[in-house]
Curated annotation (Swiss-Prot):
Function according to Swiss-Prot or TrEMBL: Catalyzes a salvage reaction resulting in the formation of AMP, that is energically less costly than de novo synthesis.
Domain of life: Bacteria
Catalysed reactions, semicolon-separated: AMP + diphosphate = 5-phospho-alpha-D-ribose 1-diphosphate + adenine
Originating organism: Mycoplasmopsis synoviae (strain 53)
Family, as annotated: Belongs to the purine/pyrimidine phosphoribosyltransferase family.
PANTHER family for this protein: ADENINE PHOSPHORIBOSYLTRANSFERASE
Keyword field contains DNA-binding: no
A Pfam entry, by short name: Pribosyltran
GO molecular function, one term: AMP binding
Record EC number: 2.4.2.7
Protein's name according to its UniProt entry: Adenine phosphoribosyltransferase
GO CC list: cytoplasm
Any one of the GO BP annotations: AMP salvage
Length: 169
């Protein structure tokens, strides 16, 4: 099974000049979804926690955590979780965004795998690393379903954490 066959290119979405990688067909096929989760999970076996960000990261992170029987921790947009949270603001090409992590969910010095759907420029992943450093967790590795290699080169060249992907474009 070729997982790339289940990722659809959508031209000019969400705006002209963009080629959007639609993972909906991959998620809608039980065998393709099962395979990508198992492939991603191979890289997460040695971590104490699986951490993923709103929203599509949750799809992969929760499934991997369930598959490996490990705790799953959500990184969310502001004001979506109760209680004290670590917060990080980061820049996007069209503005900025904020991510939060509840303070009491990850034990100090625990090892963590960060999981996401697609790696483009790495802004979200950098913010997640910063949040986990605030929580005094050890980022063991990063695992993404899809790596857009032309867009991710700068991020990967400055990254000190191992990064693995299942599908590369």
């Amino acid at each position: 099974m070729q997982l790339k066959d289940y990722v659809k290119d959508v031209l000019d979405f969400p705006k002209k000049g963009i080629v959007f990688k639609d993972i909906s067909p991959l998620l809608a096929d039980k065998d393709a979804f099962d395979l990508i989760i198992k492939e991603m999970a191979k890289y997460c076996q040695n971590s104490d926690y699986i951490v993923a960000a709103d929203a599509r990261g949750f799809i992969f992170g929760a499934a991997i955590a369930f598959h490996l029987k490990k705790p799953f921790v959500m990184v969310r947009k502001p004001k979506k979780m109760p209680g004290p949270s670590y917060s990080v603001s980061y820049e996007l090409e069209y503005g900025h965004n904020v991510l939060e992590l509840q303070e009491d969910l990850i034990k100090e010095n625990a090892s963590v795998s960060i999981v996401d759907d697609i790696l483009a420029t790495g802004g979200t992943l950098n913010a997640m690393i910063e949040l986990l450093e605030k929580a005094k967790a050890k980022v063991n590795n990063i695992v993404v379903a899809i790596d857009l290699t032309k867009l991710s080169q700068d991020f990967k060249s400055s990254l000190k954490t191992p990064l693995d992907s299942v599908i590369k474009y």
